[in-house]
Curated annotation (Swiss-Prot):
Pfam families associated with the record: IF-2B (PF01008)
Residue numbers annotated as active site: D246
Catalytic activity from the UniProt record: 5-(methylsulfanyl)-alpha-D-ribose 1-phosphate = 5-(methylsulfanyl)-D-ribulose 1-phosphate
Family, per entry: Belongs to the eIF-2B alpha/beta/delta subunits family. MtnA subfamily.
Source organism of this protein record: Pseudomonas fluorescens (strain Pf0-1)
Keyword annotations of the record: Amino-acid biosynthesis, Isomerase, Methionine biosynthesis
This protein's name: Methylthioribose-1-phosphate isomerase
């Protein structure tokens, strides 16, 4: 399976080369494939904030490389570069509030800095750590893909229809994808007849990114309006809803792209299984439940402007980027450490005590 998954890789969104972070600008896909090179932490923070790069794992990886760029600049300035670097950590941490992978990656970079031996090269150590974060996410993607396929096969091994939301593929990660990685692997195994992709308003990650990724790999994909999901579950034989996550709390509640919660409610009503796929770096054991997750809200103009024109002068918009799906609506959480079925606090704690499977 691993070799076939690697052979199927066609898309990547993050490239570290020649001392710069190169990001595929996801704001203009699929109409343009435009790579932007970043050489400063401020540039990387803005790329995260403006959604040049998006997807929780990809954000964390980008932030790690951002610290490498920051350290290079601070060391070149001279003086107390270590203290000055704290400003860059804070700048990157403030770029997106909900995706915990961002804070996980920054904490890991900070820990590596704190563990530097005397006379060690800090820049080389930080670069090696960022590359390790990138590579570990790629390996986690491969492990989760296999585990997800095993779970699908456990319940129903024949070709089936799957519904997904937002974008959780190579564009959102450092490798093959989380939820979309499972879907890709299931297709390779002959277990996917068709994928229904929610358009995912207002940024249209489903129509612009997911449909593009799947079509590029020859996986049958049907794009649908977000509001059609329940009807599709009822009439199109969907057996699984498979999504990613931006943060998972200690009790198994999941914050993901806005619209995920209603998918879980509809899946429960229609007897459709609901799978969340995310690396263990997405799990925040410091938060007891989804009630504690900060939910990012973006500019209402994303909803109020149609074709470049405002819909109404007196109309207000509520534009949360994420919602929280309660654990009791989730059939399984798949991570590189293993699978938690019917998640709860005890099962999540047990999962996080395990070593990685890859």
């Amino acid at each position: 399976m691993r070799d076939r998954l690697l052979a199927a890789e066609k898309v990547k969104a993050i490239d570290w080369r020649d001392g710069a972070l190169h990001l595929l600008d996801q704001r203009v896909l699929p109409f343009e494939e435009n790579w932007i090179a970043y050489t400063s932490a401020a540039g990387v923070a803005e790329a995260i904030r403006s959604m040049v790069v998006r997807g929780a794992p990809a954000i964390g990886i980008s932030a790690a490389y951002g610290i490498v760029l920051a350290a290079r600049a601070r060391i070149a300035e001279g003086g107390d570069w270590y203290a000055a670097l704290e400003e860059d950590f804070m700048l990157l941490a403030d770029s997106r509030p909900t995706a915990v992978n961002l804070f996980w990656a920054l904490n890991r970079m900070h820990d590596r800095l704190d563990r530097l031996k005397e006379n060690a090269d800090p820049l080389a150590a930080l670069e090696a750590e960022a590359i390790a974060i990138h590579e570990s996410d790629r390996e986690a993607n491969l492990t989760m893909a296999q585990l997800g396929v095993d779970l699908i096969r456990k319940h129903q091994g024949n070709a089936q229809a799957i519904l997904t939301h937002c974008n959780t593929g190579a564009l959102a990660t450092g490798g093959f994808g989380t939820a979309l990685g499972v879907i890709r692997a299931a297709f390779i195994e002959g277990m996917v007849e068709r994928v229904y992709a929610d358009e995912t308003r207002p940024w249209l990650q489903g129509s612009r990114l997911t449909a593009w990724e799947l079509a590029n790999e020859g996986i049958p994909v049907t794009l649908n309006a977000d509001s059609a999901a329940a009807h599709i579950m009822k009439t199109k034989g969907v057996t699984w809803v498979i999504v990613g996550a931006d943060r998972i709390t200690a009790n198994g509640d999941v914050a993901n792209k806005i619209g995920t919660y209603q998918l879980a409610v509809n899946a429960m009503h229609h007897g459709v299984r609901f799978m969340v796929v995310a690396p263990s770096s997405t799990i925040d054991m410091n938060l007891a439940s989804g009630d504690d997750i900060p939910i990012e809200e973006r500019d209402g103009a994303e909803l109020l402007e149609v074709g470049g024109k405002r819909v109404g002068a007196d109309v207000e918009a509520f534009n949360p980027v994420f919602d929280v799906t309660p654990a009791d609506l989730i059939d399984a959480i798949v991570t590189e450490k293993g699978i938690v079925e019917r998640p709860d606090t005890a099962k999540m704690a047990q999962l996080m005590c395990r070593k990685r499977l890859h």
